[in-house]
Amino acid sequence: MKIAVVGAGKWGMALAHAYSQKNEVVISSRGKRDLPNFVSLQEALSCEYIVMAVPTQFVREFMSEHFKFNGQKILVAAKGVEVSSGKFLNSVYEDFLPRENVAFLSGPSFAAEVIKSLPTALVVSSHNKELAKSFAQAMPNFIKAYTDSDVVGAEVSGAYKNIIAIAAGVCDGLELGNNARAALISRGLVEMTRFGREFGAKRDTFISLGGAGDLFLTASSNLSRNYRVGYGLAKGKSLKTILQELGEVAEGVPTTSAVLQIAIKKDIYLPIAKEVGLLLEGKDPKSSLNDLLS
Protein backbone atom coordinates (compact mmCIF):
# COMPACT_ATOMS: atom_id res chain seq x y z
CA MET A 1 0.00 0.00 0.00
CA LYS A 2 1.08 3.60 -0.52
CA ILE A 3 1.61 5.66 2.63
CA ALA A 4 2.39 9.37 2.89
CA VAL A 5 4.33 10.60 5.92
CA VAL A 6 3.67 14.26 6.68
CA GLY A 7 6.25 15.84 8.97
CA ALA A 8 9.98 15.19 8.59
CA GLY A 9 11.19 15.44 12.17
CA LYS A 10 13.08 12.52 13.71
CA TRP A 11 9.90 10.54 14.47
CA GLY A 12 8.38 11.18 11.07
CA MET A 13 11.56 10.04 9.34
CA ALA A 14 11.78 6.96 11.57
CA LEU A 15 8.22 5.97 10.67
CA ALA A 16 8.92 6.61 7.00
CA HIS A 17 11.88 4.22 7.28
CA ALA A 18 9.74 1.63 9.05
CA TYR A 19 6.80 1.71 6.67
CA SER A 20 9.07 1.74 3.60
CA GLN A 21 10.16 -1.85 4.37
CA LYS A 22 6.86 -3.26 3.07
CA ASN A 23 5.14 -0.32 1.36
CA GLU A 24 5.59 2.55 -1.05
CA VAL A 25 6.29 5.62 1.09
CA VAL A 26 6.37 9.29 0.14
CA ILE A 27 7.38 12.11 2.48
CA SER A 28 6.27 15.71 2.72
CA SER A 29 7.32 18.58 4.94
CA ARG A 30 6.99 22.33 4.76
CA GLY A 31 10.67 22.83 5.56
CA LYS A 32 12.62 19.97 3.95
CA ARG A 33 12.40 19.53 0.19
CA ASP A 34 15.65 17.61 -0.40
CA LEU A 35 14.37 14.38 1.14
CA PRO A 36 14.23 11.10 -0.78
CA ASN A 37 10.73 10.39 -2.12
CA PHE A 38 9.72 13.98 -1.36
CA VAL A 39 6.33 15.09 -2.70
CA SER A 40 4.27 18.24 -2.30
CA LEU A 41 1.88 18.59 0.62
CA GLN A 42 -1.01 18.52 -1.82
CA GLU A 43 0.09 15.17 -3.22
CA ALA A 44 0.81 13.71 0.22
CA LEU A 45 -2.52 14.77 1.66
CA SER A 46 -4.37 13.23 -1.27
CA CYS A 47 -3.02 9.74 -0.44
CA GLU A 48 -5.47 7.26 1.05
CA TYR A 49 -3.18 6.38 3.97
CA ILE A 50 -1.35 9.18 5.79
CA VAL A 51 0.95 9.16 8.82
CA MET A 52 0.70 12.58 10.46
CA ALA A 53 3.85 13.53 12.42
CA VAL A 54 2.96 17.21 12.82
CA PRO A 55 3.63 18.65 16.32
CA THR A 56 0.47 18.83 18.42
CA GLN A 57 0.20 22.60 18.81
CA PHE A 58 0.41 23.13 15.03
CA VAL A 59 -2.10 20.49 13.93
CA ARG A 60 -5.22 22.67 13.82
CA GLU A 61 -3.54 25.43 11.83
CA PHE A 62 -1.97 22.89 9.49
CA MET A 63 -5.19 21.00 8.85
CA SER A 64 -7.23 24.17 8.38
CA GLU A 65 -4.77 25.48 5.84
CA HIS A 66 -3.90 22.35 3.88
CA PHE A 67 -6.34 19.47 4.42
CA LYS A 68 -9.51 18.68 2.50
CA PHE A 69 -11.24 15.43 3.42
CA ASN A 70 -11.74 12.96 0.61
CA GLY A 71 -11.81 9.62 2.39
CA GLN A 72 -8.23 9.70 3.69
CA LYS A 73 -7.22 7.49 6.61
CA ILE A 74 -4.84 9.05 9.13
CA LEU A 75 -2.46 7.55 11.67
CA VAL A 76 -1.65 10.18 14.30
CA ALA A 77 2.00 9.88 15.32
CA ALA A 78 2.32 12.89 17.63
CA LYS A 79 1.29 12.99 21.30
CA GLY A 80 -0.08 15.77 23.44
CA VAL A 81 -3.00 18.02 24.32
CA GLU A 82 -3.97 21.13 22.37
CA VAL A 83 -3.45 24.05 24.74
CA SER A 84 -5.98 26.38 23.11
CA SER A 85 -8.91 23.95 23.40
CA GLY A 86 -7.84 21.34 25.96
CA LYS A 87 -8.62 18.66 23.36
CA PHE A 88 -6.66 15.45 22.94
CA LEU A 89 -5.01 15.12 19.57
CA ASN A 90 -7.39 12.61 18.04
CA SER A 91 -10.28 14.93 18.90
CA VAL A 92 -8.51 17.73 17.05
CA TYR A 93 -8.20 15.57 13.95
CA GLU A 94 -11.85 14.57 14.31
CA ASP A 95 -12.74 18.21 13.67
CA PHE A 96 -11.53 17.61 10.11
CA LEU A 97 -12.50 14.00 9.32
CA PRO A 98 -14.69 11.20 10.75
CA ARG A 99 -13.33 9.39 13.80
CA GLU A 100 -13.58 6.10 11.90
CA ASN A 101 -10.82 7.45 9.64
CA VAL A 102 -8.40 8.23 12.48
CA ALA A 103 -5.99 5.93 14.32
CA PHE A 104 -3.45 6.73 17.05
CA LEU A 105 0.07 5.34 17.41
CA SER A 106 1.54 4.69 20.86
CA GLY A 107 4.03 2.48 22.65
CA PRO A 108 7.61 2.58 23.96
CA SER A 109 9.70 3.79 21.04
CA PHE A 110 12.57 6.14 20.30
CA ALA A 111 13.10 7.37 16.75
CA ALA A 112 16.84 6.71 17.03
CA GLU A 113 16.19 2.99 17.53
CA VAL A 114 13.38 2.62 14.98
CA ILE A 115 15.59 4.22 12.31
CA LYS A 116 18.16 1.46 13.06
CA SER A 117 15.47 -1.22 12.67
CA LEU A 118 15.87 -2.35 16.28
CA PRO A 119 13.08 -4.52 17.78
CA THR A 120 10.12 -2.39 18.85
CA ALA A 121 6.52 -2.96 19.95
CA LEU A 122 3.78 -0.43 19.20
CA VAL A 123 0.01 -0.12 19.54
CA VAL A 124 -2.37 1.22 16.90
CA SER A 125 -5.62 2.38 18.52
CA SER A 126 -8.79 3.30 16.67
CA HIS A 127 -12.57 3.19 16.93
CA ASN A 128 -12.31 1.45 13.55
CA LYS A 129 -10.80 -2.02 14.08
CA GLU A 130 -10.14 -2.56 10.38
CA LEU A 131 -8.28 0.74 10.11
CA ALA A 132 -6.11 -0.12 13.11
CA LYS A 133 -5.40 -3.51 11.56
CA SER A 134 -4.42 -1.93 8.22
CA PHE A 135 -1.81 0.38 9.76
CA ALA A 136 -0.55 -2.37 12.08
CA GLN A 137 -0.16 -5.01 9.36
CA ALA A 138 1.76 -2.55 7.20
CA MET A 139 4.48 -2.33 9.86
CA PRO A 140 7.86 -4.04 9.16
CA ASN A 141 8.98 -7.29 10.74
CA PHE A 142 11.14 -5.58 13.36
CA ILE A 143 8.04 -3.89 14.80
CA LYS A 144 5.45 -5.95 16.65
CA ALA A 145 2.25 -3.96 16.23
CA TYR A 146 -0.82 -4.58 18.36
CA THR A 147 -4.28 -3.08 17.88
CA ASP A 148 -6.69 -1.66 20.42
CA SER A 149 -9.91 0.34 20.60
CA ASP A 150 -9.17 2.48 23.68
CA VAL A 151 -8.23 5.65 21.85
CA VAL A 152 -8.71 7.85 24.92
CA GLY A 153 -6.41 5.69 27.03
CA ALA A 154 -3.74 5.71 24.33
CA GLU A 155 -3.99 9.48 23.97
CA VAL A 156 -3.84 10.19 27.70
CA SER A 157 -0.88 7.84 28.17
CA GLY A 158 1.00 9.27 25.21
CA ALA A 159 0.55 12.82 26.43
CA TYR A 160 0.87 12.38 30.19
CA LYS A 161 4.05 10.29 30.18
CA ASN A 162 5.91 13.34 28.84
CA ILE A 163 5.01 15.28 31.99
CA ILE A 164 6.33 12.50 34.20
CA ALA A 165 9.47 12.29 32.05
CA ILE A 166 10.26 15.93 32.81
CA ALA A 167 9.99 15.21 36.54
CA ALA A 168 12.16 12.09 36.17
CA GLY A 169 14.78 14.10 34.31
CA VAL A 170 14.92 16.55 37.20
CA CYS A 171 15.27 13.64 39.62
CA ASP A 172 18.26 12.26 37.73
CA GLY A 173 19.75 15.69 37.15
CA LEU A 174 19.77 16.21 40.90
CA GLU A 175 21.36 12.74 41.31
CA LEU A 176 18.68 11.57 43.72
CA GLY A 177 19.19 7.93 42.79
CA ASN A 178 17.30 5.02 41.28
CA ASN A 179 14.99 4.60 44.27
CA ALA A 180 13.67 8.13 43.94
CA ARG A 181 13.17 7.83 40.17
CA ALA A 182 11.33 4.52 40.56
CA ALA A 183 9.05 6.04 43.19
CA LEU A 184 8.37 9.05 40.98
CA ILE A 185 7.59 6.98 37.89
CA SER A 186 5.34 4.59 39.84
CA ARG A 187 3.40 7.47 41.35
CA GLY A 188 3.28 9.02 37.91
CA LEU A 189 1.59 5.92 36.54
CA VAL A 190 -1.08 6.17 39.25
CA GLU A 191 -1.58 9.87 38.50
CA MET A 192 -1.76 9.26 34.76
CA THR A 193 -4.37 6.54 35.32
CA ARG A 194 -6.42 8.80 37.59
CA PHE A 195 -6.45 11.50 34.93
CA GLY A 196 -7.37 9.11 32.13
CA ARG A 197 -10.20 7.47 34.04
CA GLU A 198 -11.90 10.87 34.22
CA PHE A 199 -12.34 10.62 30.45
CA GLY A 200 -13.48 7.01 30.33
CA ALA A 201 -10.14 5.39 29.52
CA LYS A 202 -9.77 1.72 30.41
CA ARG A 203 -7.59 0.97 33.43
CA ASP A 204 -5.81 -1.87 31.62
CA THR A 205 -4.53 0.53 28.97
CA PHE A 206 -2.30 2.21 31.53
CA ILE A 207 -0.44 -1.00 32.35
CA SER A 208 0.06 -1.90 28.70
CA LEU A 209 2.71 -1.00 26.11
CA GLY A 210 1.15 2.38 25.41
CA GLY A 211 0.85 3.20 29.10
CA ALA A 212 3.45 1.82 31.50
CA GLY A 213 5.72 0.70 28.67
CA ASP A 214 5.98 4.13 27.09
CA LEU A 215 6.13 5.84 30.49
CA PHE A 216 9.03 3.74 31.80
CA LEU A 217 11.03 4.23 28.59
CA THR A 218 10.45 7.96 28.26
CA ALA A 219 11.08 8.69 31.92
CA SER A 220 14.36 6.80 32.16
CA SER A 221 16.46 7.70 29.12
CA ASN A 222 18.27 10.76 27.82
CA LEU A 223 17.03 9.83 24.35
CA SER A 224 13.75 11.39 25.53
CA ARG A 225 13.47 15.11 24.79
CA ASN A 226 11.15 15.61 27.75
CA TYR A 227 13.54 13.82 30.10
CA ARG A 228 16.30 16.13 28.84
CA VAL A 229 14.14 19.16 29.61
CA GLY A 230 13.92 18.10 33.25
CA TYR A 231 17.58 17.13 33.40
CA GLY A 232 18.61 20.50 32.00
CA LEU A 233 16.45 22.38 34.50
CA ALA A 234 18.08 20.42 37.33
CA LYS A 235 21.49 21.48 36.03
CA GLY A 236 20.53 25.15 36.16
CA LYS A 237 19.74 25.81 32.51
CA SER A 238 16.81 28.01 31.53
CA LEU A 239 13.84 26.43 29.76
CA LYS A 240 14.47 28.69 26.76
CA THR A 241 18.07 27.51 26.46
CA ILE A 242 17.09 23.85 26.79
CA LEU A 243 14.45 24.08 24.06
CA GLN A 244 16.89 25.88 21.76
CA GLU A 245 19.47 23.14 22.30
CA LEU A 246 16.92 20.41 21.61
CA GLY A 247 16.00 21.92 18.26
CA GLU A 248 12.72 19.98 18.27
CA VAL A 249 9.44 20.15 20.13
CA ALA A 250 9.30 18.75 23.67
CA GLU A 251 5.57 18.03 23.83
CA GLY A 252 5.58 17.72 27.62
CA VAL A 253 6.04 21.47 28.02
CA PRO A 254 2.76 22.65 26.42
CA THR A 255 1.00 19.44 27.53
CA THR A 256 1.68 20.27 31.18
CA SER A 257 -0.09 23.59 30.80
CA ALA A 258 -3.06 22.02 29.02
CA VAL A 259 -3.42 19.19 31.55
CA LEU A 260 -3.33 21.58 34.50
CA GLN A 261 -6.08 23.69 32.94
CA ILE A 262 -8.21 20.56 32.62
CA ALA A 263 -7.38 19.51 36.20
CA ILE A 264 -8.61 22.84 37.55
CA LYS A 265 -11.90 22.58 35.65
CA LYS A 266 -12.49 18.96 36.69
CA ASP A 267 -10.91 19.18 40.16
CA ILE A 268 -8.47 16.31 39.56
CA TYR A 269 -5.63 15.76 42.02
CA LEU A 270 -2.38 15.78 39.98
CA PRO A 271 0.55 16.58 42.31
CA ILE A 272 3.34 15.66 39.89
CA ALA A 273 1.86 17.61 37.00
CA LYS A 274 1.35 20.58 39.33
CA GLU A 275 5.01 20.54 40.40
CA VAL A 276 6.19 20.19 36.81
CA GLY A 277 4.08 23.22 35.94
CA LEU A 278 5.77 25.20 38.71
CA LEU A 279 9.17 23.97 37.54
CA LEU A 280 8.52 25.19 34.01
CA GLU A 281 7.55 28.56 35.47
CA GLY A 282 10.89 28.81 37.28
CA LYS A 283 10.51 27.06 40.64
CA ASP A 284 13.78 25.76 42.09
CA PRO A 285 14.17 22.08 41.03
CA LYS A 286 15.51 20.95 44.42
CA SER A 287 12.58 22.51 46.23
CA SER A 288 10.13 21.02 43.74
CA LEU A 289 11.44 17.45 44.02
CA ASN A 290 11.66 17.76 47.78
CA ASP A 291 7.97 18.70 47.88
CA LEU A 292 7.14 15.67 45.74
CA LEU A 293 9.27 13.07 47.50
CA SER A 294 9.08 14.14 51.14
Please give the residue ranges for each predicted region.
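A general structural signal for well-ordered alpha-helical segments in protein cores
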Residues: 12, 59, 86-90, 132, ...
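Internal alpha-helical scaffold of NAD(P)-dependent oxidoreductase catalytic cores
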Residues: 47, 58, 65, 92-102, ...
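NAD(P)+-binding Rossmann beta1-loop-alpha1 motif at the extreme N-terminus of oxidoreductases
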Residues: 1-41, 45-49
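Rossmann-like NAD(P)(H) cofactor-binding subdomain of soluble oxidoreductases
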Residues: 12-16, 39-118, 132-136
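NAD(P)-dependent Rossmann-like dehydrogenase/reductase catalytic/cofactor-binding core
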Residues: 168, 197-207, 211, 215-294
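Glycine-rich, N-terminal phosphate-binding loop of Rossmann-like dinucleotide-binding domains
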Residues: 8, 53-55, 220
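Glycine-rich beta-alpha junction loops
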Residues: 79-81, 106-110, 128, 149-152, ...
